[in-house]
C-alpha cells in the first residue's frame, strides 16, 4: 500500500474487502451525495451496503482514501478505461470528494497525485474526469492541476457528458 503523509494526511489505496476501508468509502461518498454538487440526497441503505462489494467485482476499479489523523476525509474512485485513439489504457476519475470542513487543505491535490502516479504505473495515456459546469471550486482546482475541456478541433466544440438512465 502506497502512503503519502503530509501533516498527518495519509493517502492509501482502498481495499474494498477491508471493513474499515469500506466504511470510510461509504462515509465520504455519502457526504458527497448529500452535498448540492453530489445531488443533495444521501445514499440509500441498499447502496451503502452493496457499494464496496460491488466495486470489488468491477475489473479495473480502484479508489484512494484520504485520512487526516486517522479519520476519513477524502475519496477518489476511479475506473480503468481505454483510449481507442491512443490504443492505450486511461484512468477515468468517477468521484472525488473531500468532507466539508476539510476542504482547502490540499487533500484533493494529494488524491490527484496518487491517481496520477497509479495511472502512470498502469501505462495510462491520460486521466479523465467529469465536473458539473457550476462546480467552480472544483473546476479551479482541476484547471490548476492541468485538466481542461476535451476537444479534438475547436470548431467541433468541447465534449459533453450525456447519460440515459436505464430502468
Region annotations inferred by a language model:
Residues 112, 119-130:
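Conserved GNAT acetyl-CoA-binding A-motif
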Residues 94, 99, 132:
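Residue-level recognition of the GNAT/N-acetyltransferase active site
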Amino acid at each position: 500500500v502506497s502512503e503519502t503523509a503530509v501533516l498527518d494526511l495519509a493517502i492509501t489505496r482502498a481495499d474494498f474487502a477491508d471493513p474499515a476501508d469500506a466504511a470510510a468509502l461509504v462515509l465520504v461518498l455519502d457526504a458527497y451525495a448529500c452535498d448540492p454538487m453530489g445531488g443533495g440526497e444521501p445514499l440509500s441503505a441498499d447502496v451503502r451496503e452493496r457499494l464496496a462489494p460491488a466495486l470489488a467485482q468491477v475489473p479495473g476499479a480502484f479508489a484512494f482514501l484520504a485520512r487526516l489523523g486517522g479519520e476519513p476525509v477524502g475519496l477518489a474512485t476511479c475506473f480503468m478505461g481505454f483510449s481507442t485513439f491512443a490504443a492505450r489504457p486511461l484512468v477515468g476519475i468517477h468521484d472525488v470528494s473531500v468532507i466539508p470542513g476539510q476542504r482547502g487543505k490540499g487533500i484533493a491535490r494529494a488524491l490527484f497525485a496518487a491517481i496520477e502516479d497509479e495511472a502512470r504505473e498502469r501505462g495510462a495515456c491520460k486521466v479523465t474526469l467529469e465536473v458539473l459546469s457550476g462546480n467552480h471550486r472544483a473546476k479551479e482546482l482541476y484547471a490548476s492541476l492541468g485538466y481542461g475541456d476535451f476537444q479534438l478541433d475547436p470548431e467541433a466544440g468541447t465534449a459533453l457528458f450525456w447519460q440515459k438512465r436505464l430502468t
